Amino acid sequence: MGVTVVSHPLVQHKLTIMRKKETSTASFQRLLKEISLLLCYEVTRNLELTTMSIETPLMPMEAPVLEGKKLVFASILRAGNGLLEGMLDLVPAARVAHIGLYRDHDTLQPIEYYFKAPEDIVNRLVIVVDPMLATANSAIAAIDKLKERGATNIRFLCLLAAPEGIERFTKAHPDVEVFTASIDERLDEKGYIVPGLGDAGDRMYGTK
């Protein structure tokens, strides 16, 4: 399905401020919510529309509305919740799935500790959100789980991606399109994206 890099000037400006090491936790949270609104606009750009009959204060008309499968936003905990908040502001009727994964710092492999998703996920477009696509291990594991539950129409949204992660992800799930604000240089020896922005979860919540 490929990779879409969202190059909108506002996205790039806000991402630069988020990258700065002196950006406070409060500012990081605010910027993450703002950028999630802009990224949500892009990842939902080609949703299908139909028309419905309405009446304006002046006259009846046929007006465009969303058609087809309803949305699920699937957040990879914990950092995914930062993107989720802004997206739900735009699409408050979307259902939500939570996928609890943490990365073993020695093996870099994901360990699942929680999974909760709507029962009718097979009938919905699922947009998986996680700020970082680094090794891609967590993203691959999350989408493996969603497919096990019947999801067939999936997109993945992140702030930053590493070339290594994109390569692994697209090989594992070639049917899932990736949307990101930036493809950075590489992964370091600890599996972090560089130049990156640090650990998104720690910067969101002020933890180490």
Curated annotation (Swiss-Prot):
Binding-site residues, uracil: 193, 198-200
Superkingdom of origin: Bacteria
Pathway(s) served: Pyrimidine metabolism; UMP biosynthesis via salvage pathway; UMP from uracil: step 1/1
Catalytic activity, reaction form: UMP + diphosphate = 5-phospho-alpha-D-ribose 1-diphosphate + uracil
Natural source organism: Brucella canis (strain ATCC 23365 / NCTC 10854 / RM-666)
Cofactor: Mg(2+)
EC number(s) reported in the record: 2.4.2.9
Cofactor note: Binds 1 Mg(2+) ion per subunit. The magnesium is bound as Mg-PRPP.
Keyword list, A-Z: Allosteric enzyme, Glycosyltransferase, GTP-binding, Magnesium, Nucleotide-binding, Transferase
Name recorded for this polypeptide: Uracil phosphoribosyltransferase
Keyword Transferase found: yes
Stated regulation of activity: Allosterically activated by GTP.
Entry function: Catalyzes the conversion of uracil and 5-phospho-alpha-D-ribose 1-diphosphate (PRPP) to UMP and diphosphate.
